[in-house]
Design a protein with these regions (language model features):
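The feature captures the C-terminal accessory region of ATP-dependent helicases
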Residues: 237-256
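Intrinsic-disorder-associated interaction segments
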Residues: 77-80, 84, 196, 203-206, ...
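Compositionally biased, intrinsically disordered low-complexity regions
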Residues: 8, 13-15, 192, 212, ...
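Short secondary-structure junctions and interdomain/linker hinges
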Residues: 44, 51, 55, 214-224
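Conserved helicase/translocase motor-coupling segment
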Residues: 2-117
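Conserved RecA-like P-loop NTPase helicase motor core
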Residues: 92-221
């Protein structure tokens, strides 16, 4: 998809380029695939295992369908499983945690009960879709695993703000923001600038969001070390300079 998107740029005045309508559709399709990347579940299992006896945990899921590796589709079918269902099954059945979905499928009364049980610690975790974007207040959240991310600064700053809301006994919140890369940093480090140029916007947007989260974090140094490794491996600084010198500025495109 990234290669196809790279072929959909059209010229504008002043040497600028923008995506065609077809390119924008492909970019949205790629965004959904990023949101539902299969290996996010594997990483979630590793990261959440130390928290299986904790409570007040939010897993923020994508609305996209889970796709097996190699599949290039985003339409629903009977063979697809929503990411949130995979999460609930893994935490509830595999890890023995008490967890419930928190989505638009639950009515206002059900949501109210879930929020109450969650706040009391009777329900360890909530797996949610879009709740941080819909004005839902759950200030008792202490740990959040963000499987679904956005490249819109306004949205991810708003989501962070909702997670950091004050609650009795809550001094801070732990936020795990899952960064999705097209391939590993080791692979990227061994490639040329031309090889990684096609994924510049995708990776740069992920790093930019990570840096925004990191700059106010207590573990700023550790977080920025990880992001700097990504930046260096994918040659983001060199690519940014090349794009600027050629009059292109892909990273400012809101659809990327």
């Amino acid at each position: 998809l990234t290669t196809k998107i790279g072929k959909c740029f059209v010229g504008k005045g002043g040497g600028q380029r923008s995506l065609s309508e077809q390119g924008k559709k492909l970019a949205l399709k790629r965004a959904r695939l990023v949101a539902a990347a299969e290996n996010k579940l594997e990483v979630l299992r590793e990261e959440i295992e130390p928290y299986t006896n904790n409570d007040h945990i939010l897993i923020y899921c994508g609305a996209a369908q889970m796709l097996d590796e190699g599949q290039d589709r985003t339409v629903s079918s009977n063979g697809d499983t929503r990411q949130i269902s995979q999460v609930v099954n893994m935490l509830g059945n595999d890890l023995g945690m008490t967890i419930s979905k928190f989505t638009s499928e639950e009515d206002i009364k059900e949501r109210s009960i879930l929020k109450s049980e969650f706040s009391l610690g009777n329900l360890q975790a909530l797996a949610a879709i879009k709740c941080l974007d819909e004005g839902v207040n759950i200030p008792s959240i202490r740990t959040a695993f963000m499987l679904a991310s956005t490249t819109n600064p306004k949205e991810y700053i708003q989501r962070r703000g909702r997670l950091l809301r004050k609650s009795e006994g809550k001094e801070y919140a732990e936020i795990f923001d899952f960064v999705t890369l097209p391939f590993s940093t080791n692979t990227a480090a061994g490639q040329t600038i031309d090889d990684v140029r096609g994924v510049y916007t995708l990776v740069n947007n992920e790093v930019a969001r990570g840096m925004e989260f990191a700059r106010h974090a207590l573990n700023f140094a550790d977080a920025t070390d990880v992001l700097d490794d990504i930046r260096e491996s994918f040659k983001l600084d060199e690519l940014k300079l090349m794009l600027q010198l050629s009059g292109q500025d892909f990273e400012e495109q809101p659809w990327a």
